[in-house]
């Protein structure tokens, strides 16, 4: 995953450093300044080494991030995207700031627009907006602020030259996770998703997970069970209700649950810890967050954000502006984390072989963004208990 667009990013980073000249970023401690006291350049590779908040010399912030619902530090979608913003800014001497729409998980389109306007008023030349719920507000803002570039993560083309839609083939990494855990030996699975069954990315994750489990079970001549729920996930938040539901699953025999929805992971991991269950993480490698994590269905959020921002500064924005870019196995933008591999019956070599089959087209994964209920998908080796949302 870290090799995603690596050569391209290396090139645009060099070009951007030349273009940016002597621009610097400063916070109170100087941690995000790319020039040290001897004038040497620091190259950041770990976003955790970069402050979330920085103070620019002129009070303006050139690169902005507008969060999706949920927490900034959700160890998932918001944080993964913001990591790319921080890395590009810090490594190129640019100021950056994040903006959270008012009213939290009850944020309206007006709240999201206000956050984008605040970013523009604060000096933003490029605004990275996370989540499909940003669409209406983003279109309004982009039409009004035509000199500002907008990167729409998990988005689509809005027919505007200053908007780049960046989406992922989540069904592919979801498939890898479902296939892997069944091959590992798990037969009683769960899925709990964010967005109430309306979020296209979460739907693709879950539908891919079910397809992967089905294909693995078919190869093993067995049938597996899958609890499938959109309950308590509309706001992508952790909640006692979600933890109670998933605890009930574990106590009734469910072995592993795919936690697909930002901070919802916290509730699922807590339930797993209490009930001796296991978890599949989402968006980023979440193995460091809980010992219950077996694997994670990942997409290259940080790399994609860096790549898209770079195009603002290297003069190639026209390649992605007024277009929808979809990233998947062909770009090495989705997958499972091999550096923290813990599975024993399904090896890294097995995974790499599976990845290659998908890449070559030997395995076709349906990407229906409306398949919120996999019980309607014609699966032959998965018994789906659909709970809805």
Give the residues covered by each predicted segment.
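C-terminal motif of bacterial Sec signal peptides marking the signal peptidase cleavage site
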Residues: 16-19
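Enrichment for repetitive, rod-forming helical segments
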Residues: 9-10, 119
């Amino acid at each position: 995953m870290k090799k995603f667009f690596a050569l391209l990013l290396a090139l645009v980073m060099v070009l951007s450093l030349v273009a940016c000249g002597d621009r610097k970023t400063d916070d109170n401690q100087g941690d995000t300044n790319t020039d040290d006291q001897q004038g040497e350049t620091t190259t950041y590779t770990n976003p955790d080494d970069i402050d979330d908040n920085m103070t620019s010399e002129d009070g303006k912030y050139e690169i902005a991030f507008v969060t999706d619902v949920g927490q900034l530090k959700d160890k998932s979608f918001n944080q993964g995207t913001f990591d790319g913003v921080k890395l590009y800014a810090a490594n190129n001497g640019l100021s950056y700031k994040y903006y959270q729409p008012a009213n939290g998980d009850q944020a309206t389109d007006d709240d999201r627009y206000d956050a984008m306007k605040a970013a523009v008023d604060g000096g933003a030349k490029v605004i990275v907006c996370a989540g499909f719920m940003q669409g209406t507000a983003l279109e309004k803002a982009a039409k009004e602020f035509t000199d500002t570039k907008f990167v729409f993560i998990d988005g689509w083309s809005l027919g505007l030259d200053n908007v780049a839609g960046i989406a992922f083939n989540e069904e592919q990494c979801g498939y890898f996770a479902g296939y892997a855990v069944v091959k590992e030996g798990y037969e009683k699975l769960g899925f709990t998703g964010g967005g109430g069954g309306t979020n296209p990315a979460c739907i693709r994750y879950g539908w891919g997970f079910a397809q992967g489990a089905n294909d693995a079970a078919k190869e093993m001549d067995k049938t597996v069970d899958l609890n499938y729920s959109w309950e308590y996930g509309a706001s992508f938040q952790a909640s006692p209700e979600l933890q109670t539901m998933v605890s009930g699953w574990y106590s009734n025999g469910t072995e592993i649950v795919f936690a697909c929805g930002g901070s919802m992971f916290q509730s699922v991991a807590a339930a797993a810890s209490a009930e001796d269950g296991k978890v599949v993480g989402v968006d980023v490698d979440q193995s460091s967050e809980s010992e219950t994590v077996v694997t994670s269905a990942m997409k290259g959020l940080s790399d994609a954000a860096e790549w898209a921002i770079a195009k603002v500064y290297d003069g190639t924005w026209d390649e992605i502006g007024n277009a929808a870019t979809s990233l998947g196995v062909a770009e090495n933008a989705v997958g499972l984390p091999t550096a923290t591999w813990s599975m024993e019956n399904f090896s890294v070599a097995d995974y790499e072989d599976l990845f290659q089959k998908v890449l070559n087209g030997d395995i076709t994964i349906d990407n229906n963004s409306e398949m919120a209920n996999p019980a309607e998908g014609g699966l032959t080796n998965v018994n789906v208990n659909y709970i809805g949302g």
